[in-house]
């Protein structure tokens, strides 16, 4: 049991070393998703929050892609791992956040359009990472 714990600790440390900026962005998105924002004049701009959602998830997914591609330039990690970790996980994470906002807070509500905006951000980041960044980093794994 002791050696298993040591291996798990090492694996966790490995993720922190490979994805430090992504982890910071994820924590920031969690904070922004659950804090009670003050009322401002910006609330009057229609759908500004949707643009913020696109940007948050574009940033999260994009950084996950960049850090994956950088960390796995020289090994045989299949590219589908990036699709799961940098696209699917942020989309599922987004859905969980929307459900938690709806059912576990009194000052936030889940919103299908927020989920769609979050997914749009992850899609945009993934397309740019796969078709623009990955070829430039010479990552050609299927």
Protein language model regions, located:
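Bulky hydrophobic segments
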Residues: 11-115, 119-142
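Short, small-residue-biased leader/transition segments that mark boundaries at the very start
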Residues: 1-7
């Amino acid at each position: 049991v002791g050696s298993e714990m040591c291996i798990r600790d090492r694996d966790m440390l490995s993720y922190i070393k490979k994805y430090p900026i992504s982890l910071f962005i994820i924590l920031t998105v969690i904070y922004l998703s659950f804090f009670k924002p003050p009322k401002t004049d910006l609330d009057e701009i229609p759908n500004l929050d949707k643009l913020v959602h696109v940007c948050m998830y574009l940033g999260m997914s994009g950084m996950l892609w960049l850090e994956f591609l950088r960390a796995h330039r020289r090994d045989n990690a299949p590219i589908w791992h990036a699709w799961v970790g940098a696209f699917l996980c942020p989309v599922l994470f987004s859905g969980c956040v929307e459900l938690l906002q709806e059912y576990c807070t009194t000052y936030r509500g889940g919103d299908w359009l927020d989920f769609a905006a979050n997914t749009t951000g992850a899609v945009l980041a993934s397309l740019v990472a796969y078709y623009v960044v990955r070829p430039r980093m010479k990552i050609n794994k299927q």
